[in-house]
């Protein structure tokens, strides 16, 4: 509830990822979607797998006491899986559905990333067109939720960034709207001075330069996707 009030009061654009693990041995929704896609692609019955994913989202909806349903979305997803939708489409549903829930919860407009994040026909990312689409779409949009991790080609084919790509989407939105501040909320408490799996209770880094941020990201720090640096540095957000 506190996070909701913070978003409504101070934040204009929110870019969510797919639901992660609820506990250590849990499975991330993205991995569940990939597994469901594999079953569908192999001609196997994937109904139970998709129902389990639906249940995960319903748990979130119920926990937020929302009068909101994803039933029709899952009907469409099942149909698309049956019609051999690609792996990128399957994986992207994690962010898309989570974005719809968050938009309903915050009272923000939902903007599908497929409409504003553009990939070329060869699957490469189109930075220039994306910036134009985002700028034009959001200029008259006071608040919005834009799901991370994916976009689409001009023909509507869904394409994803690499894992952790919601950070990239967030940086693209920040650049497009010339944001004064970009925040990256995650389950990790900032950048740490050492690997917490090796060093017990390492201190966090309070201030970091763009160069240090890039180096830590490329070295494997999972707080921020390495590619996000490029867009943030361009605007010095």
What is the meaning of each model-derived region?
Residues 231-237:
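A short, hydrophobic C-terminal helix/tail in secreted or cell-surface proteins
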Residues 1-5, 9-231:
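Nucleotide/pyrophosphate-binding catalytic subdomain
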């Amino acid at each position: 509830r506190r996070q909701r009030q913070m978003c409504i009061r101070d934040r204009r654009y929110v870019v969510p990822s797919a639901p992660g693990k609820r506990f250590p041995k849990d499975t991330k929704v993205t991995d569940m979607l990939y597994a469901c896609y594999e079953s569908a692609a192999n001609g196997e019955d994937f109904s139970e797998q998709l129902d389990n994913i639906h249940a995960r989202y319903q748990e979130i909806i119920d926990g937020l006491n929302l009068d909101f349903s994803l039933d029709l979305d899952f009907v469409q997803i099942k149909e698309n899986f049956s019609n051999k939708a690609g792996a990128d489409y399957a994986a992207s549903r994690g962010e898309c559905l989570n974005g719809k829930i968050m938009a309903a919860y915050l009272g923000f407009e939902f903007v599908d990333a497929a409409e504003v994040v553009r990939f070329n026909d060869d699957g490469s990312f189109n930075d220039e067109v994306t910036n134009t689409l985002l700028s034009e779409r959001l200029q008259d949009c006071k608040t919005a939720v834009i799901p991370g991790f994916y976009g689409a080609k001009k023909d509507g084919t869904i394409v994803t960034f690499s894992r952790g790509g919601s950070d990239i989407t967030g940086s693209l939105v920040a650049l497009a709207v010339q944001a004064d501040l970009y925040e990256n909320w995650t389950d990790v408490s900032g950048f740490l001075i050492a690997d917490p799996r090796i060093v017990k209770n390492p201190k966090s880094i309070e201030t970091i330069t763009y160069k240090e941020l890039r180096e830590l990201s490329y070295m494997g720090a999972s707080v921020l996707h390495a590619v996000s640096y490029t867009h943030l540095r361009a605007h010095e957000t």
